[in-house]
Amino acid sequence: MAEYLPCVEVEAGGPITSAVIWLHGLGADGHDFEPVVPALGLRDLGVRFILPHAPRRPVTVNMGLIMRAWFDLRGLDFQGDVDEKGIRESVAQVEALVARERGRGIASGKIALAGFSQGGSIALSVALRHPEPLAGVVALSTYLPAGPWAEGRATAVFQAHGTEDPLIRLERGEETRDRLQALGCDLTWKTYEMGHSVCPEEIADIGAWLRASLGTPAPA
């Protein structure tokens, strides 16, 4: 039997007909975005939210401190020296979660990925290389790392970034936006007056985008 990442699961409505796999940022865990789920306004839909915990690993930029991380960060310019091994491992682990949802009867076109910061990097990397088209990706305050995962299948993307982000600067988000558009992605780009975080307006926009992307009309 396959071993999966430990996950928090929250079901909104029923029967379950779609799934969102949501990846947290560096140093957080699957509970980080759990309070966001009810705020998305999708209670009427049959959506299963899967919020996995990243493995623990040493993180170079944090003096080797062991924390939950999807891959090692060796610098804060988010360019150049990329932890390809860590990215490949996390991509494979998330792909396994997608396959599990397929095994639960969810069509690939009803599975969306979401991620914040380096969680968004993995979500984008999985969706662009996945053999079946997914419903789309919610990429928050993130960037697409250099490597083979920066090429592949065009997909629907909701990308959002804080204009005052001190960690992953807006320019890096804009570079990723341009790369995704060059790949032919159906991209929705939003900016918000905030730092490296999320805000209520953004959460409302994510909820509306997920509702449309999962193919379920809003209630009257």
Regions inferred by a protein language model and the residue ranges of each:
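Serine-hydrolase catalytic machinery in alpha/beta-hydrolase-like enzymes
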Residues: 1-112
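Residue-level signal for short, function-critical loop segments
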Residues: 25, 117, 143, 163, ...
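Alpha/beta-hydrolase-fold catalytic nucleophile elbow
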Residues: 52-53, 114, 138-141, 160, ...
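Short beta-strand/loop motif that positions the catalytic acidic residue
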Residues: 158-161, 165
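C-terminal catalytic histidine-bearing segment of alpha/beta-hydrolase fold enzymes
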Residues: 171-220
